[in-house]
Amino acid sequence: MDFPASENLFPGPVLGIETSCDETAAAVLDGSGRILAEIVLSQYDDHARFGGVVPEIAARAHLAYLPGMVTEVMDKAGLRFQDLAAIAATSGPGLIGGLLVGAGLGKGLALAAKRPFIAINHLEAHALAALLPALGGVAEITSGEHFPFLLMLLSGGHCQCILVEGVGRYRRLGGTIDDAVGEAFDKVGKLLGLGWPGGPALERLALQGNPHALAFPRPMKGRVGCDFSFSGLKTAVAQYVARFPDGPLPLSDAADIAASFQAAVADVMADRATAALAMADEIAPAKMLVVSGGVAANAAIRAALSTAAEHRGIAMLAPPPRLCTDNAVMVAWAGLHRLKYGAVSGLDHAPLPRWPLDAPDMALPESTTP
C-alpha cells in the first residue's frame, strides 16, 4: 500500500534494528508506515546442529552480520543516516548478548547522525505489528479506533494475554505457568524427530494427519482466568511416543500425533481467548482480538482464534506470517509510535533481558499520553 507524503501521520523515516534472539534484521519505514526496505537473516544454519539457539553464537552472528545489513537496508531505502527521524532498536526482553549488539549499534548510529535513539520493547513491537498500515489504513490506526484490544502474544519465549488500552498502556491478564506455546511445539517436534525448530515442520506434518485420532488433554481449558499450561500436554505426547521404542515412528502415526497435538493447542487457545475477552469486559471491552508472535503464523491456531473472536462479534487481526516471526519492520513501526509521543531513550539506556510490557517505564510521557 503506497501512501502519499501528505498522509504521513508519524515523524519519519525510522530505522529499526532487531537482534533479540536468532534473527538479525533491519528495516526502514517512512512516516506513513510504508516499508521502504527490510532484510531478515535467519541464523538457522548457525544453531541447527545444536538443536536450539546458543546465546554466544547468536551474539557473535549479530555482530558479524548487522553492520553490513544496516548499510544495505539504508542503500535500498535511498537514505542517509542524517535523513532519518530516529533510530529504534530492540532493547529487551531477549538474549542479552544479542540485545547489546543491536542496541549498541543503534546508539552509535544515533550519536553519529545526531538523531534520537528509541529503545524498543520486543513485546510492544509484536503487539503493534498487526496494526501496520497495509492491514488497516493508517488514518484509522492512528485515530485510536482499534483500542482497546486483546493481544494474544504467542511465541517460543512468550505466551500471554494482554489488554492493550493504547500505546504504552498494557495490562497483563494471564500467561503460561510453565512452557511457552512455541517452546511446546518445538519440544513435540523434537519428539517426532523433526529437528529444530520443530514448530513449522510439525504444522506441515499435521496436514497429513487426523486431528481427532488421539485424545490429548486440553490443559487449563474451562479454568477461571486465562492462564496457560503446556507441560502436561507435552508429557502426554512423550508418553504416547514412548510406545514406539524400537525405531522411528511410522509416518502415519507421527502425522496423527502432530495433528492431534496441534488441535489440542488450538482448542486451548480458543478457550483462553474467550476467557480473556470476558475478563477484558470487566475493565475495557476489547474491540478486536490481535494475535502476534511466531506461533501466530500457524494456520490452525489462527483459524481457531478467528472463530473465537467471531463468536464474540469482534474481528481477529494478525500480521502476515512473515511479520509474525521476529523482524525489524515491527521494531521501526513501534519506533514511529514512540517518536510521535516523544518517548525517546537516553544513550545510557541499558538493554534488559527481562522487560514486561506492564513495566512502569513502558508508559508514555504524561504530557503526550493519548
Swiss-Prot record:
Its main location: cytoplasm. SUPFAM superfamilies: Actin-like ATPase domain. Keywords: Acyltransferase, Cytoplasm, Iron, Metal-binding, Transferase, tRNA processing. It holds the Pfam family TsaD. One of its GO terms (biological process) is tRNA threonylcarbamoyladenosine modification. It is an enzyme of class 2 (transferase). Its EC number is 2.3.1.234. It comes from the Bacteria. Fe cation binds at residues 122, 126, 326. InterPro entries: ATPase_NBD, Gcp-like_dom, KAE1/TsaD, TsaD. Its cofactor is Fe(2+). GO terms for molecular function: iron ion binding; N(6)-L-threonylcarbamoyladenine synthase activity. Binds 1 Fe(2+) ion per subunit. It is found in: Cytoplasm. Substrate binds at residues 153-157, 186, 199, 298. It catalyses: L-threonylcarbamoyladenylate + adenosine(37) in tRNA = N(6)-L-threonylcarbamoyladenosine(37) in tRNA + AMP + H(+). One of its GO terms (cellular component) is cytoplasm. Required for the formation of a threonylcarbamoyl group on adenosine at position 37 (t(6)A37) in tRNAs that read codons beginning with adenine. Is involved in the transfer of the threonylcarbamoyl moiety of threonylcarbamoyl-AMP (TC-AMP) to the N6 group of A37, together with TsaE and TsaB. TsaD likely plays a direct catalytic role in this reaction. Belongs to the KAE1 / TsaD family. NCBIfam families: gcp_kae1 (TIGR00329), T6A_TsaD_YgjD (TIGR03723). This is tRNA N6-adenosine threonylcarbamoyltransferase. The gene is tsaD.
